[in-house]
Amino acid sequence: MRSCRALAMASKVYFHSVTVFEAVGGADTFKVLVERFYAGVAADPVLRAVYPEEDLSGATERLTLFLIQYWGGPDDYSARRGHPRLRLRHQRFAIGQVERDAWLRHMTAAVDSLDPAPDIRKSLIDYFETTSTAMINRPA
């Protein structure tokens, strides 16, 4: 398995000589993406069990910082929280195919709401599909 740093470096996909972070408009775009994603999560009975109410604002901040860093922005996530260790950090939640599919449905809707360029959309969705599948930690 590749290290997070290797994945972060691999994610610095360039479009016309800029990172995805720069191409989509920087931190503000990722803040909007995550806000729209969690609006869907908050209304989803499958995912509400995975996201405790008292931690939604913390989850929002963590995901925003992680995505900003992953897609080529500042390394604030790692500076505050250390190595992302995505699988380890998600082990305490029961994530099966149903939860993964619900998560991906809301993230895809949030991405599409931004109306990104097709090549950027593909990069984002490919990453979210792969990563959400890797978070599955219980059988179907």
Question: What is the meaning of each model-derived region?
Answer:
Residues 10-17, 31-112, 116-118, 125, ...:
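Heme-based O2/NO sensor domains and their adjacent alpha-helical segments
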Residues 21-23:
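Short, motif-level signal for alpha-helix interfacial/capping segments enriched in acidic residues
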